[in-house]
């Protein structure tokens, strides 16, 4: 093609031939050039017009709001920390959720389902007792939906958690560290009785485990192609382990459900060893095959190892889950990583 186009010019010794229009190659070149100019002018005119998302285009967007980004988190394989074992531990990276933890799932579920049942309406004030990630997730969900959100938490909660909640527009009420989460829950109930708002109550709300039954469980089953043999999770409100275990057991009754709780006297953010009278009402002991008592030191060290050896920056509760999976590595095949650490840890805990 290059030779054809250049030949007439060379033949004319530097002069364009008088019969150029009769040459097929030159006619093609001229038509192509004209079309390119027309196209360029039309593009320039279009670019000068103000751009807007019309209704038809907006309907093709994959995510209409940030709420649509909750769930469908990746499952990755633990590598360097596995040592010589031939077993596989898989980590569910819930930190990929918009507000940074697995709690995004139940937070959005509790508000959305309450709306569908008419239990809350625009203009209502929502109240919740929280120790961290649930509060952050609820603050995000309330911001999306336009609700006023009041969160009650112990005053020894980290500054990072408080800052994240207020950044989403939530109002904080602090109780003393001696009152703890039990005191926060009692205050939430009193405020609701006084008509100051409506308590979502993550500890007794069936929409909490339902969120995991309809999303976390199916995701793990699909991502492992049904080969999961164990599910390991830390226990706080117990919503994650209750909902996920229900789904996995329906698919395969032989899947082993392993829960993590702090050992006596230990304090692990995001995991609780509840007094009997405050045990979450959504908790059903027959859904858990084994409970491991976890120490704070082991959970924190595993958290640091995940960052340094696997490149996974997570929280202490997640470190506890992985520590539990590693502890039973000779029998476990898959574990879940239920939280991401950026929004729950003090900087000095990662040193």
Where do the PLM segments sit?
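Extreme N-terminal basic, low-complexity initiation segments
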Residues: 1-11, 21
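Residue-identity detector for glycine
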Residues: 2, 12-16, 30, 341
């Amino acid at each position: 093609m290059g030779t054809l186009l250049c030949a007439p010019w060379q033949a004319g010794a530097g002069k364009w031939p008088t019969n150029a229009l009769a040459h097929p190659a030159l006619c093609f070149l001229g038509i192509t050039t004209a079309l390119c100019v027309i196209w360029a002018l039309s593009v320039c005119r279009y670019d000068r017009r103000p751009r807007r998302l019309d209704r038809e285009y907006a309907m093709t967007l994959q995510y209409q709001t940030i709420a649509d980004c909750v769930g469908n988190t990746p499952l990755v394989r633990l590598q360097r920390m596995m040592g010589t074992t031939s077993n596989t531990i898989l980590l569910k990276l819930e930190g990929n959720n918009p507000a940074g933890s697995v709690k995004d799932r139940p937070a959005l579920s509790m508000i959305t389902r309450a709306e569908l049942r008419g239990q809350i309406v625009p203009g209502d004030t929502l109240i919740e007792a929280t120790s961290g990630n649930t509060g952050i997730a609820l603050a995000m969900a309330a911001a999306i939906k336009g609700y006023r959100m009041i969160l009650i938490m112990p005053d020894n909660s980290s500054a990072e958690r408080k800052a994240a909640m207020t950044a989403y527009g939530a109002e904080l009420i602090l109780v003393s560290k001696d009152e703890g989460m039990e005191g926060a829950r009692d205050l939430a109930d009193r405020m609701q009785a006084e008509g100051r708002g409506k308590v979502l109550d993550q500890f007794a709300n069936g929409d909490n485990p339902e969120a995991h039954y309809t999303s976390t469980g199916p995701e793990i089953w699909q991502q492992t192609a049904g080969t999961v043999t164990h599910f390991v999770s830390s226990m706080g409100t117990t919503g994650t382990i209750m909902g996920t275990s229900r789904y996995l057991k329906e698919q395969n009754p032989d899947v082993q459900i392993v829960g993590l709780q702090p050992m006596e006297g230990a304090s692990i953010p995001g995991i609780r060893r509840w007094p009997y009278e405050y045990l979450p009402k959504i908790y059903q002991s027959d859904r858990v095959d084994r409970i491991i008592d976890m120490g704070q030191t082991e959970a924190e060290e595993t958290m640091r190892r995940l960052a340094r050896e696997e490149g996974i920056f997570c929280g202490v509760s997640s470190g506890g889950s992985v520590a539990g999976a590693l502890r039973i590595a000779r029998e476990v095949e898959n574990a879940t990583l239920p939280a991401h650490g950026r929004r729950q840890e003090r900087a000095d805990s990662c040193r």
